[in-house]
Amino acid sequence: MPVAVGPYGQSQPNCFDRVKMGFMMGFAVGMAAGALFGTFSCLRFGMRGRELMGGVGKTMMQSGGTFGTFMAIGMGIRC
């Protein structure tokens, strides 16, 4: 399949770059959502200090990885 050329002679990103970009965007959105939901959840359980930071960080990484994976799969389907 020939490489599509955009305006001004710029080439389009290949499929791997699109999947990588989808993962990074999804990871960023998931981290932000994880920060909000993780903070709320940990504060509801009465966590403070180091325990709070660990719980929020764990939630951020989990939600970022999950949402990033789904976004990468979605971008891979679109290739």
UniProtKB/Swiss-Prot annotation:
Alphabetical GO biological process terms: cellular response to reactive oxygen species; defense response to bacterium; positive regulation of reactive oxygen species metabolic process; protein import into mitochondrial matrix; protein insertion into mitochondrial inner membrane; replicative senescence
Protein keywords: Antibiotic, Antimicrobial, Membrane, Mitochondrion, Mitochondrion inner membrane, Transmembrane, Transmembrane helix
One GO CC annotation: TIM23 mitochondrial import inner membrane translocase complex
Membrane topology qualifier: Single-pass membrane protein
Chief site of localization: mitochondrion
Spans annotated as Sufficient for antibacterial activity: 42-60
UniProt-annotated location(s): Mitochondrion inner membrane
Residue ranges crossing the lipid bilayer per the database entry: 23-43
Domain of life: Eukaryota
InterPro entries: Romo1/Mgr2
Function: Has antibacterial activity against a variety of bacteria including S.aureus, P.aeruginosa and M.tuberculosis. Acts by inducing bacterial membrane breakage. Induces production of reactive oxygen species (ROS) which are necessary for cell proliferation. May play a role in inducing oxidative DNA damage and replicative senescence. May play a role in the coordination of mitochondrial morphology and cell proliferation.
The family this protein is said to belong to: Belongs to the MGR2 family.
UniProt protein name: Reactive oxygen species modulator 1
Organism: Xenopus laevis
Gene from which this protein is expressed: romo1
